[in-house]
């Protein structure tokens, strides 16, 4: 059959050589070649056209060589209810051919798929009209996606297929400033739309997918020719190197706690201090809703900085994720309140919530129940003022509040190692506080008295924190102020902990009652 006599508007996806004028054809369904087919899903065939539809016949005696494709392709179409699209990939070109098990390859790139539609088929057919997909390097590049953000890949950079944005980001990170800190839990989603939201998680994912510095000059090292299969030692070397780089990124500038002197630990705590947070002061006179809205917005902003501050404490990131979350959920309001006391220590009768939000005691009368909390904050601040609290002492005290905030038992046996690290870290911060007090020049007896006075004030901070949490929960239940984001998560965690303690307390009381009944019945039986 002559191709010139076929209908002009027919876009056949069949690959053929432009120099040939006759293309042998055979009837029957075919499938678009794909390097990835999900084995766990079934696909039904949907015919787009057939010889009967386009009104031409096929010679029965035409010879078709092996590997030829048919003229009536049936497209693999997902069955109803299946949401995963079919992957359409061109065959790899000889020029850019890669070993199937190359250490540079990443299996995650197979997860990226193209949706099947008529436009895709037309583009595929038009692209193969004059060149075979087997020998077209451009068709291979079109079928690859960035292993980091899932955007279209511009090439093979630093050992993986990546886009220009992730390539430039990784280049900047390995050449310059890369001590990024995740404001959340190091589990941010990195995709095309959110790749710029968290630099720390983006760099972590770069290392996870296999980006390495040694792969930056791949095109200049003869990789354009077909490479031989690497041996197993080469595989292990590349994988171990990528893993080491990933561990180095997740622990940026991490110092071994055992080698830190008290002075170095204090300096690290000083560098970890969060910045001042600004919040717009509501218009006067204050109302219950306006004041609570300002305080909750401020608390939510400070919580983000508090998490970053905790991650910068040497040894905190070595704890298990369970212990990290548990400590932050238990002490978040204590940490915020002791920071409020430090800002207010030079302003008697004032509470410096923020540089642009300064309140006195009388302004708290507009909110029901908050006046008692203001009095507790002012009294504890006055006691710190009498002791002439120093800035380095404040840094150590705040870190001790975080590390000593939770006394709940470990959830599993594997948490024992994390608990041991937590105890070691708390002892190191306590030694730093003792060192700071010793440098003040007072006698040994006065040093012991001062240390005891500072530690006794922590119970007052905890009491004020409990009152504040209870008041905030009441305001939330009364719908006085909406609570969102991190602040809502902290309150929910406090509520869940309270429910668990109530359950355990009721169970304990029932056990005591049953034991008392058994004890009273035994003498009667005798």
UniProtKB/Swiss-Prot annotation:
Source species: Sus scrofa
Keyword Nucleotidyltransferase: no
Taxonomic classification: Eukaryota, Metazoa, Chordata, Craniata, Vertebrata
Zinc finger (NR C4-type) stretch: 146-166, 182-206
Record's signal peptide: none
The protein's name: Estrogen receptor beta
GO molecular function: estrogen response element binding; nuclear estrogen receptor activity; nuclear receptor activity; steroid binding; zinc ion binding
Subunit structure: Binds DNA as a homodimer. Can form a heterodimer with ESR1. Interacts with NCOA1, NCOA3, NCOA5 and NCOA6 coactivators, leading to a strong increase of transcription of target genes. Interacts with UBE1C and AKAP13. Interacts with DNTTIP2. Interacts with CCDC62 in the presence of estradiol/E2; this interaction seems to enhance the transcription of target genes. Interacts with DNAAF4. Interacts with PRMT2. Interacts with CCAR2 (via N-terminus) in a ligand-independent manner. Interacts with RBM39, in the presence of estradiol (E2). Interacts with STUB1/CHIP.
Gene Ontology biological process terms in this record: cellular response to estradiol stimulus; estrogen receptor signaling pathway; positive regulation of DNA-binding transcription factor activity; positive regulation of DNA-templated transcription; regulation of transcription by RNA polymerase II
